A protein has these predicted regions:
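Conserved glycine-rich cofactor-binding loop
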Residues: 17, 24-25
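Conserved glycine-rich Rossmann-like NAD(P)H-binding loop of the short-chain dehydrogenase/reductase
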Residues: 38-54
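Rossmann-fold cofactor-recognition segment
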Residues: 61-79
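Active-site Tyr-X3-Lys motif and surrounding loop/helix of classical short-chain dehydrogenase/reductase
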Residues: 83-90, 108-109, 115-122
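Conserved NAD(P)H cofactor-binding loop of Rossmann-fold oxidoreductase domains
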Residues: 101-108
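Catalytic loop of short-chain dehydrogenase/reductase
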Residues: 108-109, 118, 144-195, 202-219
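Ankyrin-repeat alpha-helix packing hotspot
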Residues: 125-126
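C-terminal helical subdomain
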Residues: 220-232
Length: 232
């Protein structure tokens, strides 16, 4: 079944607003496109405003009757998250769903630290936790929260004592960060949330640009693998 035939079987999103973090590329951009296709409006929360505005311009040329807003959002930066939450509460508290898609997978040759922890963990897990901690207590009404999980969550990994532990490989960092995201989902889904509902999605093997910072031969190998895998 083609993606459009599949989407045609789903309910319309007319008069509904969906917020997507990291909505300028990869899975996030695909989600934005499909929400617009189903008649919804979108708020793209993104770090790169220039790229976000380019995406907005292209999409509105196709979906002229839809509405797209942009909120500056760097999931590795505490102040950026808090500022973005304030904007959501003031301008977009009527949102139907929040898709927490933003995330990174660092190249081991360009490992960076933020607040004395690896950027992958800071962005993928700590940032999501801070977003929800600041947003949920101030929200009213019914809202859906969609966590972006991963097939690697829960894989056997190196034991750590703190999220600030060092000497972790890029893949170990990613496993820890995505295991943390899924732990957040299980935590919130067990609470009495007064109209809030929580969902966990795992995209499986998907062709995205999450490894865009890796050496060219790794990016090439990844594309070849996915092409072979999806040919069956």
């Amino acid at each position: 079944m083609s993606i459009k035939k599949y989407l045609n079987n789903l309910q319309q999103l007319s008069n509904k607003k969906v917020i997507v973090t990291g909505g300028t590329s990869g899975i996030g951009l695909s989600i934005v496109k499909e929400v617009l296709f189903k008649g919804g409006d979108v708020v793209i929360m993104a770090r790169n405003l220039s790229k976000a505005n380019e995406v907005k311009e292209k999409l509105l040329a196709k979906y002229m009757n839809r509405h797209i807003d942009i909120v500056e959002y760097d999931q590795s930066d505490n102040q950026s998250i808090i500022k973005a939450v304030d904007i959501v509460l003031k301008e977009h508290q009527d949102f139907y769903a929040l898709v927490m898609n933003a995330g990174i997978f660092q190249n081991k040759h360009k490992l960076c630290l933020k607040d004395d922890m690896y950027l992958t963990i800071k962005t993928n897990y700590v940032g999501v936790n801070l977003l929800l901690t600041n947003l949920l207590p101030k929200l009213k009404g019914e809202h859906r929260f969609i966590f972006q999980g991963s097939l690697v969550a829960g894989w056997h990994n190196k034991s750590i004592k703190s999220l600030k532990d060092k000497n972790l490989s890029a893949f170990q960092q990613y496993i820890i960060s995505k295991s943390g995201v899924e732990a957040l989902f299980y935590h919130y889904s067990t609470l009495n949330n007064n109209g809030f509902s929580f969902y966990l999605v795992e995209p499986g093997l998907t062709s995205t640009d999450i490894i865009r910072d890796f050496p060219s031969f790794i990016r090439w190998a990844g594309k070849v693998f996915l092409k072979v895998f999806f040919s069956f």
